[in-house]
Amino acid sequence: MLAFNFFGATEGGLFDINATLPLMAIQVVALTYILNSLFFKPVGKVVEKREKFVSNNIMEAKNKLSEVEKLEADLLSQLQSARSEAQKIVSDAENESDKLYKEALELANNEANASKEKARLEIENQTSSARDQLFKQADDLSELIVNRLILEK
């Protein structure tokens, strides 16, 4: 018996086949069922619910991000068009200002030329009038001299 015990297992060992093994199997199945119904299913539902919540939030965030990017692009295009419009308005205002400046300068030059021409004509008239008066006075004086010379002779 000693030789048999040396090679084999003793009674009540791990590999004894009796009612304990099926009872342990039933306990494992029952424990698995109880844990599944009381712990794993509710935890699984909570995990699924949380996963759904997270995926919905991620989807919403992606949608909002795409909407923000679209709005940003729209605002950038509006800003660009506003800048170009403002630049056009400034350019038009500068052109109008230059045009008004040139018109005012031309008008001032025309008025100055007209005044100059008027002054020249007035000076010419006065010169002509003075010359005529001098000629008349010279005629009168020469007539007076001639009359005195005639009277003295």
Curated annotation (Swiss-Prot):
Its main location: membrane. GO terms for molecular function: proton-transporting ATP synthase activity, rotational mechanism; proton-transporting ATPase activity, rotational mechanism. The keyword Thylakoid applies. The chain crosses the membrane at residues 23-40. Coiled coil: none annotated. It is a single-pass membrane protein. Pfam families: ATP-synt_B (PF00430). One of its GO terms (cellular component) is proton-transporting ATP synthase complex. It is found in: Cellular thylakoid membrane. Gene3D superfamilies: F1F0 ATP synthase subunit B, membrane domain (1.20.5.620). Keywords: ATP synthesis, CF(0), Hydrogen ion transport, Ion transport, Membrane, Thylakoid, Transmembrane, Transmembrane helix, Transport. F(1)F(0) ATP synthase produces ATP from ADP in the presence of a proton or sodium gradient. F-type ATPases consist of two structural domains, F(1) containing the extramembraneous catalytic core and F(0) containing the membrane proton channel, linked together by a central stalk and a peripheral stalk. During catalysis, ATP synthesis in the catalytic domain of F(1) is coupled via a rotary mechanism of the central stalk subunits to proton translocation. Component of the F(0) channel, it forms part of the peripheral stalk, linking F(1) to F(0). The b'-subunit is a diverged and duplicated form of b found in plants and photosynthetic bacteria. Belongs to the ATPase B chain family. F-type ATPases have 2 components, F(1) - the catalytic core - and F(0) - the membrane proton channel. F(1) has five subunits: alpha(3), beta(3), gamma(1), delta(1), epsilon(1). F(0) has four main subunits: a(1), b(1), b'(1) and c(10-14). The alpha and beta chains form an alternating ring which encloses part of the gamma chain. F(1) is attached to F(0) by a central stalk formed by the gamma and epsilon chains, while a peripheral stalk is formed by the delta, b and b' chains. This is ATP synthase subunit b'. The gene is atpF2.
